[in-house]
Amino acid sequence: MESQVFSKVIVESENKVKSVVGFKQHRYLYKELQKTNNDFYVGVYGLRGIGKTVLLLQLASSTKKSLYVSADAVYLSNYSIYDIAEEAANRGYKNLFIDEIHTRTNWTADLKTLFDEGRIHIVFTGSSAANVKRGADLSRRVIMHELLPPSLREFLNIKLNAGAEKVSIHALFNESTRKNIAVKYTKWLTYWQDYYRYGGVLYDAKVSFPKPVMSAIERIINVDLASVRQIDSAIVNDVYKMLYKIAKSGPYEMSYNNLADYVGVSVKTVINLVKDLEKVGLLKLVYPYKGGFRKEPKLYFRLPFRSAINESLGLATDIGVAREEFFANNVPLSGYVKTERGTKTPDFIVDGKTIEVGGTGKTNYQKADFLAIDDTDFIGNKIPLALFGFLY
């Protein structure tokens, strides 16, 4: 690599790292990644716009003899990942932080060779597309981490400097500790709807909403989806029709059959498209607990895609759908509950407990263990819905 090119890499790395020095908040993965054993390379994948680049720069800032580089930089297009890493190692760098590694076609082969040579440690990020997770030949060399979209807690801390700490699901299940948590976070409990509307990403989605989010959706479809399957204009049109239909409907209303009828494609095509849309981070699928006679999932969006699509269509998102989707995006679920007839319900299994999601008038007609209600009430088996946004 020419000296002037690498000099530019150094200058850009220093400027980028300096740009995050003032950021006091960190994504939830930061401390875990700091403790990672250097015996392995580290990969972080996740949806666009949720803080992967800032996370990588913060790690570089706190690591000695480190260099940051964006793999999609145009001036580096003639150099492979191996070329860049080899030059960094030759100049005494011990840690290389590579952003957007999925934009390089031969990145897995380069990482394999670099790991086996053992001259430099690498941490890298990529989109949520499946090609970032595919590297089977890297399984002995790389520890992969998914960076989830920011939780309500992280949204409040990053945007409003709330200083909110994580809570455990077991603390919410205990009435005494739940009371203390609810009182402590009372002023933040009404923010879940703002978070639902535009808080699942960290770029400034609130300004000119929903345009920034719709632009992100377009890029995810045309770039990320194209990296996991072949697409053409017809498939892109089918994807948009599916997304619009899902956005306007409740998760309990959607099925593979009615989506196939609406779009005009086979059920198999719908199933494959839905799975691919989950891989690239647009959808979140929640399957029935213990299967049942049909294992068809509930179809949720990652936040804030449903609200953006609906607002672009001049529609309001149903509040019941918003509550469920907020819950599904913030809680590690074991699955949703079906009735004996196979009807989808707003009940979810979380750590062995049944939790029913609803509004202030929700009654315990399903005999759930707990009610996640859109209120501040924490008495008995009621848990304020917003508190489920503080789990990570």
Where are these regions (language model features)?
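A cross-kingdom feature that marks ATP-driven nucleic-acid transaction machinery
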Residues: E2-V21, K64, L282-Y392
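Hydrophobic positions on the alpha1 helix immediately C-terminal to the Walker A/P-loop
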Residues: L55, L59
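Accessory nucleic acid-recognition modules appended to NTPase machines
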Residues: V201-E340
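Conserved lysine of the Walker
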Residues: K52
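Hydrophobic anchor at the beta1->P-loop junction of P-loop NTPases
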Residues: V44
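Interdomain motor-coupling "hinge/lid" segment immediately C-terminal to the ATP-binding subdomain
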Residues: E2-F6, S127, K133-N237, L243
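Short glycine-rich substrate-engagement loop in P-loop NTPases that contacts/grips substrate
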Residues: K64-N95
